[in-house]
Amino acid sequence: MLLTGCDKRPATETWKPRSTSGQVEYELASAPIDAPRPLDHPVTGKLPVRFVSYNLRNYLTMVRHDDDKKSMRSKPEKEITALVSVLTKAQPDVLGVCEIGTQADLDNLQDRLEANGLKLPHSHLCSGSDPYRRQAILSRYPITVSPKPNINFQMDGRNFQMFRGILDVSIQLPGGPVRFLGVHLKSKRKVPEYDEELMRRHEAYLLAQHLAKLGDHPALLLYGDFNDTKRSTSIRSITKHLKPLNLKDKDLSTWTHYWEYQDVYSRFDYIFVSKRLEKRINHAKSHIISSPEVRKASDHRPLYVEIN
Protein backbone atom coordinates (compact mmCIF):
# COMPACT_ATOMS: atom_id res chain seq x y z
CA MET A 1 0.00 0.00 0.00
CA LEU A 2 1.26 3.43 -0.94
CA LEU A 3 1.58 5.77 2.03
CA THR A 4 1.30 9.47 1.30
CA GLY A 5 3.34 12.06 3.20
CA CYS A 6 0.29 12.82 5.35
CA ASP A 7 0.09 9.29 6.73
CA LYS A 8 3.61 7.99 7.33
CA ARG A 9 4.20 7.28 11.00
CA PRO A 10 6.80 9.51 12.70
CA ALA A 11 8.55 9.15 16.00
CA THR A 12 9.68 11.39 18.82
CA GLU A 13 11.44 14.68 18.38
CA THR A 14 15.17 15.15 17.95
CA TRP A 15 15.27 18.93 18.42
CA LYS A 16 16.53 20.27 21.72
CA PRO A 17 13.62 21.64 23.82
CA ARG A 18 13.73 25.18 25.12
CA SER A 19 11.76 27.25 27.61
CA THR A 20 7.98 27.58 27.23
CA SER A 21 7.89 31.38 27.44
CA GLY A 22 5.32 32.80 25.03
CA GLN A 23 3.46 29.48 24.66
CA VAL A 24 -0.09 28.84 25.81
CA GLU A 25 -2.17 25.78 26.62
CA TYR A 26 -5.90 25.13 26.22
CA GLU A 27 -8.16 26.52 28.92
CA LEU A 28 -10.90 24.05 29.82
CA ALA A 29 -12.99 26.52 31.80
CA SER A 30 -16.71 26.75 31.04
CA ALA A 31 -16.58 30.29 29.65
CA PRO A 32 -19.09 31.15 26.89
CA ILE A 33 -17.83 29.87 23.57
CA ASP A 34 -17.96 33.33 22.00
CA ALA A 35 -16.23 35.10 24.85
CA PRO A 36 -12.60 34.14 25.49
CA ARG A 37 -10.97 36.08 28.28
CA PRO A 38 -9.83 39.57 27.23
CA LEU A 39 -6.20 40.52 26.75
CA ASP A 40 -4.54 42.51 29.48
CA HIS A 41 -3.73 45.45 27.23
CA PRO A 42 -4.29 46.67 23.65
CA VAL A 43 -1.60 46.19 21.03
CA THR A 44 0.08 48.60 18.68
CA GLY A 45 1.44 47.79 15.26
CA LYS A 46 1.22 48.48 11.56
CA LEU A 47 -1.62 47.72 9.18
CA PRO A 48 -2.26 45.65 7.21
CA VAL A 49 -1.69 42.50 9.24
CA ARG A 50 -0.21 39.68 7.16
CA PHE A 51 -1.56 36.16 7.72
CA VAL A 52 -0.16 32.97 6.18
CA SER A 53 -1.66 29.47 6.28
CA TYR A 54 0.76 26.66 5.40
CA ASN A 55 0.87 22.86 5.48
CA LEU A 56 4.56 22.28 6.23
CA ARG A 57 4.67 18.64 5.08
CA ASN A 58 5.89 16.67 8.06
CA TYR A 59 7.96 19.12 10.10
CA LEU A 60 8.74 16.25 12.49
CA THR A 61 10.87 13.17 13.01
CA MET A 62 9.69 10.08 11.13
CA VAL A 63 10.82 7.13 9.01
CA ARG A 64 12.22 8.53 5.78
CA HIS A 65 13.57 6.77 2.70
CA ASP A 66 16.93 7.51 1.12
CA ASP A 67 18.50 5.22 -1.52
CA ASP A 68 16.19 2.37 -0.47
CA LYS A 69 17.24 2.80 3.16
CA LYS A 70 14.91 3.66 6.02
CA SER A 71 15.93 5.75 8.99
CA MET A 72 14.38 8.00 11.63
CA ARG A 73 15.08 11.57 10.60
CA SER A 74 13.65 15.05 10.90
CA LYS A 75 12.42 17.04 7.92
CA PRO A 76 15.27 17.29 5.38
CA GLU A 77 17.42 20.37 5.86
CA LYS A 78 17.01 21.48 2.24
CA GLU A 79 13.22 21.48 2.70
CA ILE A 80 13.47 23.44 5.95
CA THR A 81 15.82 25.99 4.35
CA ALA A 82 13.36 26.53 1.51
CA LEU A 83 10.42 26.73 3.91
CA VAL A 84 12.11 29.30 6.14
CA SER A 85 13.03 31.35 3.07
CA VAL A 86 9.41 31.33 1.85
CA LEU A 87 8.10 32.48 5.20
CA THR A 88 10.72 35.14 5.86
CA LYS A 89 9.97 36.65 2.46
CA ALA A 90 6.24 36.68 3.21
CA GLN A 91 6.84 38.20 6.69
CA PRO A 92 3.56 37.08 8.28
CA ASP A 93 2.42 38.67 11.52
CA VAL A 94 0.35 35.55 12.19
CA LEU A 95 1.24 32.10 10.86
CA GLY A 96 -1.05 29.05 10.98
CA VAL A 97 0.56 25.70 10.18
CA CYS A 98 -0.39 22.04 9.67
CA GLU A 99 1.79 18.95 10.01
CA ILE A 100 4.00 20.18 12.81
CA GLY A 101 5.17 17.53 15.29
CA THR A 102 5.95 18.11 18.95
CA GLN A 103 6.52 21.27 20.97
CA ALA A 104 10.23 20.81 20.26
CA ASP A 105 9.50 20.90 16.52
CA LEU A 106 7.49 24.08 16.96
CA ASP A 107 10.30 25.61 19.03
CA ASN A 108 12.76 24.69 16.29
CA LEU A 109 10.67 26.38 13.60
CA GLN A 110 10.18 29.45 15.79
CA ASP A 111 13.92 29.73 16.44
CA ARG A 112 14.84 29.31 12.77
CA LEU A 113 12.38 31.99 11.71
CA GLU A 114 13.68 34.41 14.33
CA ALA A 115 17.28 33.73 13.28
CA ASN A 116 16.28 34.78 9.77
CA GLY A 117 14.51 37.97 10.77
CA LEU A 118 10.93 36.82 11.44
CA LYS A 119 10.12 37.06 15.15
CA LEU A 120 6.84 35.41 16.15
CA PRO A 121 7.25 35.04 19.93
CA HIS A 122 3.73 33.83 20.76
CA SER A 123 2.61 30.31 19.84
CA HIS A 124 0.01 27.65 20.51
CA LEU A 125 0.15 23.92 19.68
CA CYS A 126 -3.10 22.04 19.06
CA SER A 127 -3.66 18.29 18.79
CA GLY A 128 -6.40 15.71 18.30
CA SER A 129 -6.22 11.93 18.33
CA ASP A 130 -3.24 11.88 15.94
CA PRO A 131 -0.23 11.50 18.27
CA TYR A 132 2.25 12.66 15.65
CA ARG A 133 0.93 15.50 13.48
CA ARG A 134 -0.45 18.63 15.05
CA GLN A 135 -1.47 22.17 14.21
CA ALA A 136 0.10 25.35 15.52
CA ILE A 137 -0.29 29.08 15.28
CA LEU A 138 2.55 31.59 15.74
CA SER A 139 1.99 35.30 16.21
CA ARG A 140 3.67 38.65 16.62
CA TYR A 141 0.83 39.53 19.00
CA PRO A 142 -0.40 37.80 22.20
CA ILE A 143 -2.68 34.78 21.77
CA THR A 144 -5.80 34.07 23.82
CA VAL A 145 -6.88 30.42 23.67
CA SER A 146 -10.61 29.65 23.65
CA PRO A 147 -12.17 26.73 25.55
CA LYS A 148 -11.38 23.54 23.66
CA PRO A 149 -14.11 22.69 21.09
CA ASN A 150 -15.80 19.30 21.04
CA ILE A 151 -13.88 16.91 18.78
CA ASN A 152 -15.64 13.65 19.72
CA PHE A 153 -18.09 11.79 17.48
CA GLN A 154 -19.50 8.36 16.69
CA MET A 155 -19.25 6.60 13.34
CA ASP A 156 -20.53 3.11 12.57
CA GLY A 157 -21.14 2.55 16.27
CA ARG A 158 -17.57 3.40 17.27
CA ASN A 159 -16.14 6.40 19.13
CA PHE A 160 -13.67 8.67 17.34
CA GLN A 161 -11.95 12.03 17.77
CA MET A 162 -10.92 14.51 15.11
CA PHE A 163 -7.37 13.60 14.15
CA ARG A 164 -5.90 17.10 14.56
CA GLY A 165 -8.65 18.83 16.51
CA ILE A 166 -9.88 22.39 16.03
CA LEU A 167 -7.39 25.13 16.83
CA ASP A 168 -9.36 28.06 18.29
CA VAL A 169 -7.66 31.28 19.42
CA SER A 170 -8.25 35.02 19.47
CA ILE A 171 -5.53 37.54 18.67
CA GLN A 172 -5.77 41.26 19.37
CA LEU A 173 -4.49 42.84 16.15
CA PRO A 174 -3.85 46.56 15.53
CA GLY A 175 -7.10 46.79 13.55
CA GLY A 176 -9.12 44.94 16.17
CA PRO A 177 -9.43 41.38 17.52
CA VAL A 178 -9.71 38.41 15.15
CA ARG A 179 -10.68 34.86 16.08
CA PHE A 180 -8.61 32.27 14.20
CA LEU A 181 -9.80 28.68 13.70
CA GLY A 182 -7.43 26.12 12.19
CA VAL A 183 -8.17 22.61 10.93
CA HIS A 184 -6.47 19.74 9.12
CA LEU A 185 -9.15 17.27 8.05
CA LYS A 186 -8.67 13.57 7.29
CA SER A 187 -6.64 12.89 4.15
CA LYS A 188 -8.03 11.12 1.08
CA ARG A 189 -5.82 8.09 1.59
CA LYS A 190 -7.88 4.90 1.71
CA VAL A 191 -7.58 2.87 4.90
CA PRO A 192 -9.14 -0.52 5.78
CA GLU A 193 -10.45 0.54 9.19
CA TYR A 194 -13.10 3.04 8.01
CA ASP A 195 -14.40 5.14 5.13
CA GLU A 196 -12.01 8.11 4.83
CA GLU A 197 -14.62 10.31 3.12
CA LEU A 198 -17.20 9.63 5.82
CA MET A 199 -14.55 10.37 8.45
CA ARG A 200 -13.79 13.72 6.79
CA ARG A 201 -17.50 14.55 6.65
CA HIS A 202 -17.87 13.86 10.36
CA GLU A 203 -14.89 16.11 11.12
CA ALA A 204 -16.34 18.86 8.91
CA TYR A 205 -19.71 18.47 10.62
CA LEU A 206 -18.12 18.98 14.05
CA LEU A 207 -16.44 22.09 12.69
CA ALA A 208 -19.76 23.34 11.28
CA GLN A 209 -21.39 22.76 14.68
CA HIS A 210 -18.69 24.85 16.32
CA LEU A 211 -19.19 27.62 13.76
CA ALA A 212 -22.94 27.58 14.40
CA LYS A 213 -22.31 28.06 18.12
CA LEU A 214 -20.14 31.08 17.38
CA GLY A 215 -22.98 32.66 15.39
CA ASP A 216 -22.51 35.93 13.53
CA HIS A 217 -18.99 36.56 14.82
CA PRO A 218 -17.66 40.05 13.93
CA ALA A 219 -14.18 38.86 12.98
CA LEU A 220 -13.70 35.15 12.32
CA LEU A 221 -11.09 33.54 10.06
CA LEU A 222 -11.02 29.79 9.38
CA TYR A 223 -8.01 28.29 7.64
CA GLY A 224 -6.20 25.04 7.01
CA ASP A 225 -5.89 21.88 4.93
CA PHE A 226 -9.42 20.55 4.32
CA ASN A 227 -8.29 17.70 2.06
CA ASP A 228 -11.33 18.16 -0.18
CA THR A 229 -12.55 20.12 -3.19
CA LYS A 230 -14.86 23.12 -3.10
CA ARG A 231 -18.04 21.28 -4.21
CA SER A 232 -17.61 18.45 -1.71
CA THR A 233 -20.05 17.86 1.13
CA SER A 234 -17.34 18.73 3.64
CA ILE A 235 -16.61 22.14 2.14
CA ARG A 236 -20.27 22.98 1.53
CA SER A 237 -20.99 22.41 5.21
CA ILE A 238 -18.53 25.22 5.96
CA THR A 239 -19.73 27.69 3.31
CA LYS A 240 -23.13 27.77 5.03
CA HIS A 241 -21.43 29.78 7.76
CA LEU A 242 -18.41 31.55 6.22
CA LYS A 243 -17.31 32.88 2.86
CA PRO A 244 -14.27 31.34 1.11
CA LEU A 245 -11.63 33.70 -0.22
CA ASN A 246 -10.99 33.05 -3.91
CA LEU A 247 -7.21 33.12 -3.74
CA LYS A 248 -5.03 32.66 -6.83
CA ASP A 249 -1.34 32.72 -7.66
CA LYS A 250 0.34 35.19 -10.02
CA ASP A 251 -0.70 33.01 -13.00
CA LEU A 252 -4.32 32.90 -11.78
CA SER A 253 -4.06 29.22 -10.81
CA THR A 254 -5.93 28.06 -7.70
CA TRP A 255 -4.28 24.72 -6.81
CA THR A 256 -2.68 24.41 -3.39
CA HIS A 257 -1.55 20.76 -3.28
CA TYR A 258 0.51 18.65 -5.69
CA TRP A 259 0.47 14.85 -5.49
CA GLU A 260 3.62 13.90 -7.36
CA TYR A 261 2.92 10.16 -7.50
CA GLN A 262 -0.23 10.67 -9.60
CA ASP A 263 0.75 14.09 -11.02
CA VAL A 264 -2.46 15.60 -9.64
CA TYR A 265 -2.97 19.26 -8.70
CA SER A 266 -5.82 20.05 -6.26
CA ARG A 267 -7.18 22.87 -4.17
CA PHE A 268 -7.30 21.47 -0.64
CA ASP A 269 -6.24 24.54 1.39
CA TYR A 270 -8.72 27.33 2.07
CA ILE A 271 -9.31 30.49 4.06
CA PHE A 272 -12.88 31.36 5.04
CA VAL A 273 -13.99 34.60 6.70
CA SER A 274 -17.09 36.01 8.36
CA LYS A 275 -19.08 38.67 6.51
CA ARG A 276 -17.87 41.52 8.67
CA LEU A 277 -14.23 40.45 8.56
CA GLU A 278 -14.36 40.26 4.77
CA LYS A 279 -14.65 44.05 4.70
CA ARG A 280 -11.20 44.23 6.33
CA ILE A 281 -9.56 41.88 3.80
CA ASN A 282 -7.32 43.40 1.13
CA HIS A 283 -8.41 41.12 -1.72
CA ALA A 284 -6.03 42.69 -4.23
CA LYS A 285 -2.98 41.76 -2.14
CA SER A 286 -4.18 38.35 -0.90
CA HIS A 287 -2.96 35.38 -2.93
CA ILE A 288 -1.42 31.90 -3.14
CA ILE A 289 2.35 32.12 -2.75
CA SER A 290 4.17 30.57 -5.69
CA SER A 291 7.91 30.23 -6.21
CA PRO A 292 10.55 27.54 -6.87
CA GLU A 293 11.31 27.52 -3.14
CA VAL A 294 7.68 26.67 -2.36
CA ARG A 295 7.98 23.49 -4.42
CA LYS A 296 11.13 22.51 -2.50
CA ALA A 297 9.60 23.17 0.92
CA SER A 298 6.33 21.23 0.84
CA ASP A 299 3.72 19.52 -1.31
CA HIS A 300 1.35 22.37 -0.39
CA ARG A 301 1.46 26.05 -1.29
CA PRO A 302 0.97 28.71 1.40
CA LEU A 303 -2.00 31.08 1.42
CA TYR A 304 -1.35 34.79 2.09
CA VAL A 305 -4.00 37.26 3.29
CA GLU A 306 -3.79 40.91 4.35
CA ILE A 307 -6.16 42.16 7.07
CA ASN A 308 -6.81 45.86 7.66
Spans of model-derived segments:
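N-terminal, active-site-proximal structural segment of metallo-dependent hydrolase catalytic domains
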Residues: 6-115, 125-128, 204-205
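Second-shell loop/turn segments in exported
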Residues: 38-41, 68-74, 91-99, 125, ...
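Active-site-proximal beta-strand/loop segments in catalytic clefts of secreted hydrolases
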Residues: 54-57, 98-101, 125-129, 140-141, ...
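Active-site beta-strand/loop signature of hydrolases that rely on acidic residues for catalysis
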Residues: 54-56, 83-107, 180, 206-236, ...
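Metal-dependent phosphoester/phosphodiester hydrolase catalytic core
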Residues: 65, 174-202
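Sec-dependent bacterial lipoprotein signal peptides
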Residues: 1-4
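Structured beta-strand-rich core segments of catalytic domains in phosphoester-bond hydrolases
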Residues: 100-179, 185
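Metal-dependent phosphoester-hydrolase catalytic domains
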Residues: 7-38, 211-220, 227-308
